[in-house]
């Protein structure tokens, strides 16, 4: 039975321009694929759902990928509870930009770790792939977070990507609560340093399976 307590989660979708951040967000919220590319400055969406028998209100902020909005992006990062770092599997450059976004989040949050998930989007375009699944998984391993490949167009793993970051926020908050209750002090930035443990089964679940 789902809990009736409504917890709001502030999720921020970040990544380079044209990687499909808006398409993923709108597919989650409206179950609709947006075909045309219209660069985003800032859009906010809300959706109520049940994740692991707990009611959740997802407050999703879709951010600009263009470099000229980087100062505005830092403002979003201050309020976000969890981040989806999105690249396109068809763009090596967008993949390489993910490291910069991750470092920016940790700097703004003043943490060594914060809830994130690495998302390789456009996995329906296998013939145009420039970034292997192994590379995406390795980057996520380096970050200590989960990796998942998605397709907004084919609605592959869209819900899973957003639900997984909510699960990671819950796990992180429990660790923080335990850390505070334990009265620990001194760890680098005032919080637990433990990264997300991702099992081999969970790694496999992040793959992109296209039904022909």
UniProtKB/Swiss-Prot annotation:
Alternates between an inactive form bound to GDP and an active form bound to GTP. Activated by a guanine nucleotide-exchange factor (GEF) and inactivated by a GTPase-activating protein (GAP). Pfam families: Ras. Disulfide bonds: none annotated. One of its GO terms (molecular function) is G protein activity. It is found in: Cell membrane. It comes from the Eukaryota. GTP binds at residues 15-22, 62-66, 121-124. Belongs to the small GTPase superfamily. Ras family. This is Ras-like protein. It comes from Botryotinia fuckeliana (Noble rot fungus). The gene is ras1.
């Amino acid at each position: 039975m789902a809990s009736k307590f409504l917890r709001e989660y502030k999720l921020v979708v970040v990544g380079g321009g044209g990687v499909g951040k808006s398409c993923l967000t709108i597919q989650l919220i409206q179950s609709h694929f947006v075909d045309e590319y219209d660069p985003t400055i800032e859009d906010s969406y809300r959706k109520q759902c049940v994740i692991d028998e707990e009611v959740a209100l997802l407050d999703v902020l879709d951010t600009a990928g263009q470099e000229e909005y980087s100062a505005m992006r830092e403002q979003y990062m201050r309020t976000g509870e969890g981040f989806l770092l999105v690249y396109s599997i068809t763009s090596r450059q967008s993949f390489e930009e993910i490291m910069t976004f991750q470092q920016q989040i940790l700097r703004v949050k003043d943490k060594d770790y914060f809830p994130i998930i690495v998302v390789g989007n456009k996995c329906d375009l296998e013939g145009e792939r420039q970034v292997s699944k192994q590379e995406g998984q390795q980057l996520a391993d380096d970050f200590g977070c989960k990796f998942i490949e998605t397709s907004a167009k084919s609605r592959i793993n869209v819900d899973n990507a957003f639900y997984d970051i909510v699960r990671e926020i819950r796990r992180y908050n429990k660790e923080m609560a335990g850390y505070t209750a334990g009265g620990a002090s001194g760890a680098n930035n005032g919080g637990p340093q433990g990264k997300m443990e991702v099992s081999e089964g969970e790694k496999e679940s992040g793959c992109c399976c296209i039904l022909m």
